[in-house]
């Protein structure tokens, strides 16, 4: 399973019994469901439409949709969240767009999937739902950091948020071949590259947004990670873009 959760649009009402519990799926409602619930859903296009959401899309959702870190992470027991009155025309358009983009543009598909997740009004519940359904500590911690990359994160902050000891987190990350320091650096550097590529901020602002108090330290960290300074990286991007434009002309 490569996906974290699935978004389901209900075309016809039906009920499911899961773990001796009846779940009613009402027509024209939107659900975000766990893998366990997804595997119980009928394979019937006339009853429902499904879009699976992968880890990369979830992490982009945390960064791009101006989310706030949940004040408390609650263990997902239901396996789903329902949105009973979504804007139908927009939902239809998103599902159709995702279907078309699936074979043409992964970038566009990701953007449309992010818009689909944003349809759920209970944003904090959705954020918590996604994080509890991510199956690796690496992605879980990356997701938490992504809510506020500018914050000065420490391992104890993560431990308090997910009600787990620091030693257990270290062990789980070691088993996954990484560490908290590496995850924090990777998340900051990927975000820095994204901001620099957008050409919307000065290097000073990029450093601040990525959690660095010192611009010079950020520049050194960026060069150590990517092999070039932020300004040289941007020049390379511009050079590639100019080359593409000349080819098109």
UniProtKB/Swiss-Prot annotation:
What's an example GO BP annotation here?
response to X-ray
GO MF, one example: sequence-specific DNA binding
Q: Which residues bind DNA?
A: 156-177, 203-226
- Check the record and name the Pfam families matching this protein: HTH_18
Which residues does the UniProt record annotate as the domain HTH araC/xylS-type? 139-236
Q: Which UniProt keywords apply?
A: DNA-binding, Repressor, Transcription, Transcription regulation
Matches recorded under SUPFAM superfamilies: Homeodomain-like
- Domain of life the protein comes from: Bacteria
> What is the additional note?
Encoded by the cryptic lambdoid prophage DLP12.
Q: What does this protein do?
A: Induces the synthesis of acid phosphatase (AppA) and several other polypeptides (such as AppBC) during the deceleration phase of growth. It also acts as a transcriptional repressor for one group of proteins that are synthesized preferentially in exponential growth and for one group synthesized only in the stationary phase. Also involved in the stabilization of the sigma stress factor RpoS during stress conditions.
Kindly provide the name given to this protein in its UniProt entry: HTH-type transcriptional regulator AppY
Encoding gene per record = appY
């Amino acid at each position: 399973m490569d996906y974290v959760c699935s978004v389901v649009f209900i075309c016809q009402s039906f009920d499911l019994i899961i773990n001796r519990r009846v779940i009613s799926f009402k027509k024209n409602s939107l659900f975000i469901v766990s893998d366990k619930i997804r595997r119980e859903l009928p394979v019937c296009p006339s009853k429902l439409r499904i879009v699976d959401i992968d880890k990369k899309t979830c992490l982009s959702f945390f960064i791009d949709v101006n989310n706030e870190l949940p004040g408390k992470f609650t263990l997902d027991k239901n396996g789903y969240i329902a949105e009973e009155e979504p804007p139908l025309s927009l939902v239809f358009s998103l599902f159709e767009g995702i279907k078309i983009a699936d074979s043409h543009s992964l970038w566009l598909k990701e953007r449309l999937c992010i818009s689909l997740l944003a349809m759920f009004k209970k944003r904090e519940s959705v954020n918590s739902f996604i994080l509890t359904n991510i199956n690796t500590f690496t992605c879980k911690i990356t997701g938490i950091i992504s809510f506020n990359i500018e914050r000065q994160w420490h391992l104890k902050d993560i431990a308090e948020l997910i009600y787990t000891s620091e030693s257990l987190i270290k062990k789980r990350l070691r088993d996954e071949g990484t560490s908290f320091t590496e995850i924090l650096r990777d998340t900051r550097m990927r975000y820095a590259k994204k901001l620099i590529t957008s050409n919307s901020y000065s290097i000073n602002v990029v450093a601040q947004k990525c959690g660095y108090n010192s611009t010079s330290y950020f520049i050194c960290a960026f060069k150590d990670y990517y092999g070039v300074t932020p300004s040289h990286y941007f020049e390379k991007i511009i050079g590639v873009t100019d080359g593409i434009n000349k080819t098109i002309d």
